[in-house]
Amino acid sequence: MLTAQRVAQDLDGELIGDSEIHINSVCKIDAGTKDAISFLANPKYEQFLETTEAGVVLVKTDQVLPSRKDITFIKVKDPYTSFCIILGKYFNPVSHPKGISEKCHVNGNIDIIEGLYLGEFSVIGKNVSLGRNVKIYPQAFIGDNCTIGENTVIYSGVKIYSETKIGNNCTIHSGTVIGSDGFGFALQNDGTYIKIPQVGNVILEDDVEIGANCTIDRATMGSTILRRGVKLDNLIQVAHNVEIGKNTVIAAQAGISGSVKLGDNCVIGGQVGFVGHITIADGTQIGAQSGIPKSITEPGKQWIGSPIMPLKEAFKAQVIYRKLPELDTRVNNLEKNK
């Protein structure tokens, strides 16, 4: 039975309250039951410390606690990360299968390595290399000459075209397509287009996670590359020859045009659009629905808008924009009174 004392030991936290309270579930800070554990990381939810029904709450080391004796508090440096650790260790429902279904189809030979799972109606191409504990769920397709590293999970309906290289500890969610042709056509004098052959590939380094229904195009030449630790939300388009730097995270419906180079540790909001052939500096943060028409060269800055502006300038511009109807009325009155 999981107790508050065990959680405090796992997290090296300071326990305040009943060390023997049992924990059977997790909950949000504004809900819960006496046998549930929750956390407070964002100050805007601090009010719920007075009303939460959770029996155990993770808080920051400097958190001022309410005078409640019915809650056990555990003080930790980072409640959000600590909660993730507890979720993963004690409450993660994912249990991947093992074995090779008789209904999967393998073209050629593959090594039957430890922990391998090939689900029903999955298709494995020729000369495919699969690492230890790879999980390929039903109806996934792996093209010829692909490499998939250890502990990588490929969920149902994923399509991975030939020559793709995927590292260790990656997760690719259902409906994603990796390695399809980049959008390359040469305009002719008569207005028609000739397709440019896309002869490159896609490389996903270690610890990459791709959400559902993303599309990552192969390079025209060379490689489209997602560096170590990249995390993509659902419904994201990554065009040919894009490079996404280490530990960059991108929210849903973003579109990254061809040959864009995103730096390390960038944070990209939902529905952001990038023009092609630009470079984005390390640590850049871009707000949702922004349009990026040119390179960002200064690292660690925040941007928003379409076209983008520095965050503080954008806020000032919004204040002026909201005043435009009033200013228009005043100008019209001045014109009338000339």
Regions found by a protein language model. Give the residues of each.
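Structural signal for interior beta-strand "rungs" in well-ordered beta-sheet cores
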Residues: 39, 99-310
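Terminal amphipathic alpha-helical/low-complexity segments used for targeting or macromolecular assembly
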Residues: 1-103, 164, 169, 175-176, ...
